[in-house]
Amino acid sequence: MVNRTAIIKQPDNISCFNDVYKLQKEYQEALILDNSNPDFIWIGEHQLCYTLGRGSNYDNLLFSLNDEKYDVFKIDRGGEVTCHMPGQLVTYLILDLKNFNKDLNWYLRKIEKIIIKILGNFNIDCHLKKGFTGVWIENKKIASIGIGCRRWITINGFSINFNCELENFNKIVPCGIENCLMANMIDYNKNLNIKEVKKIVKKIIQEEFNFDFVSK
């Protein structure tokens, strides 16, 4: 496969979800209009917020939408409600699947493979769970996936809990899974820092998609 150029952004600050979502939409629209434009990868952290997919059930929010303490966004992805917050590493991939494989099931399995390789790099033993999307450690979920796709241009991506306040997941039914327990990477390898994990995320995505990265 010929290497494809991708723009990568890895901000050090904690980012507002809505600002980054608008950025994703801009890059997606640019690729739809002209597929010679580069793909786009964003790796970072968000301020506390909750996001719902296109068909999400609002019953999985265990607080009122009128409660101004919580920022809630309905976005272009599949899946149910999830939570983003500092200490959780989020990766967005705006890719033209026509250059890889026009198969969303293939793409989801690819992301799961990437997550397992990332965690394995830090000697964290994880696995898939039959009937569910995402990655698990023992009986706890450590990584969630939510994607959208328009004209084979993807949006959104995956999150890995690094060292976040897992209590924030108690405000929802995570991914619509009753009694879903969540896990942090740091609980399984104390000698980690999030900057090192970000480097490995970048490296593995570059290898799996044969990207030439350009920082912007």
Swiss-Prot record:
Pathway: Protein modification; protein lipoylation via endogenous pathway; protein N(6)-(lipoyl)lysine from octanoyl-[acyl-carrier-protein]: step 1/2
Gene3D superfamilies, alphabetized: Bira Bifunctional Protein, Domain 2 (3.30.930.10)
PROSITE patterns from the UniProt entry: BPL_LPL_CATALYTIC, LIPB
Highest taxon, organism lineage: Bacteria
EC number of this enzyme: 2.3.1.181
Primary residence: cytoplasm
Site positions for Lowers pKa of active site Cys: 141
Miscellaneous notes: In the reaction, the free carboxyl group of octanoic acid is attached via an amide linkage to the epsilon-amino group of a specific lysine residue of lipoyl domains of lipoate-dependent enzymes.
HAMAP family: LipB (MF_00013)
Protein name, entry field: Octanoyltransferase
Species per Swiss-Prot/TrEMBL record: Prochlorococcus marinus (strain MIT 9312)
